[in-house]
Curated annotation (Swiss-Prot):
Compartments where found: Nucleus
Natural source organism: Saccharomyces cerevisiae (strain ATCC 204508 / S288c)
Protein name per Swiss-Prot or TrEMBL: Zinc finger protein RTS2
Lineage, opening ranks: Eukaryota, Fungi, Dikarya, Ascomycota, Saccharomycotina
SUPFAM superfamilies from the UniProt entry: beta-beta-alpha zinc fingers (SSF57667)
Additional observations: Present with 4590 molecules/cell in log phase SD medium.
Keyword rRNA-binding: no
One Gene Ontology term of the molecular function aspect: zinc ion binding
UniProt entry tagged with the keyword DNA-binding: yes
Length: 232
């Protein structure tokens, strides 16, 4: 059994609680792998390769936007405009099981992502943003700009996304109505046919007329009188 203070012990405890390394999570398949070997095997599986072939540039762009937006919102809501370690913010962000993972974005590491935010002017970074090295001495301090989440470009992008969602919802509603209409027509048409074919009480009545159409009444025979007088 591993020691209480060993890394192996806490790794097993994290696995029991369902806390796995985010680097071994497949965002496309939404599957968490246990270690590097499992993640590598998953990347070679037919189901994963099939889904990867269906990913478009718009999907990758959406992952980048969602990851960046979620990170910045958490930074602003919990820490305001004070300086904070980026690693602490990231650890808080990944506690949400439904978050977009970094390995699904264009960012290779948290350091590279923080430099990207600094160059974009969305956060203040206490480091050289033009440096390309991944090793940073000390904490990776960042501070958000007050206007970083309410820029006009992002507001316009959100409006366009809402309009697109409304168009998609209207199209889906139209399809559902047409499908329901077709199903209703299929139900009523067989019922009408069965009612017509099942009514066997009606029969044809043939009427035939002879002669000129007049009805001749038979004359009543009158017995002869005893006195010999005849009446016509």
């Amino acid at each position: 059994m591993a020691d209480y203070d060993s890394a192996k012990y806490w790794s097993k405890q994290g696995a029991r609680r369902g806390l796995q390394k985010t680097r071994y999570y497949c965002q496309i398949c939404q599957r968490q792998c246990k270690d590097a070997n499992g993640f590598q095997s998953h990347n070679k599986s037919p189901s994963h390769l099939r889904k990867i072939s269906q990913v478009t540039a718009e999907d990758a762009r959406r992952y980048n936007i969602q990851f960046e937006k979620g990170f910045l919102q958490l930074l602003k809501q919990r820490h305001g405009e004070k300086w904070i370690d980026a690693n602490k913010v990231y650890n808080e962000y990944v506690q949400d099981r439904d978050h977009v993972h970094m390995n699904a974005t264009m960012h290779r590491s948290l350091t590279q992502f923080v430099r990207y935010l600094g160059r974009a002017g969305k956060v203040d970074v206490d480091m050289d943003i033009d440096d390309t090295s991944e090793n940073v001495e000390g904490p990776l301090l960042i501070r958000i700009h007050p206007s970083s989440l309410s820029s006009p470009s992002e507001d316009g992008m959100l409006r366009s996304q809402q309009e697109e969602q409304e168009v998609i919802a209207a199209e889906l509603l139209k399809r559902q109505l047409n499908r329901a209409k077709r199903q209703t027509e299929k139900v009523y048409q067989p019922e009408m046919k069965s009612e017509i074919s099942g009514d066997s009480t009606l029969k044809r009545v043939q009427v035939t007329f002879h002669g000129n159409g007049r009805v001749n009444k038979k004359k009543k025979k009158v017995p002869p009188r005893k006195d010999g007088i005849k009446f016509r």
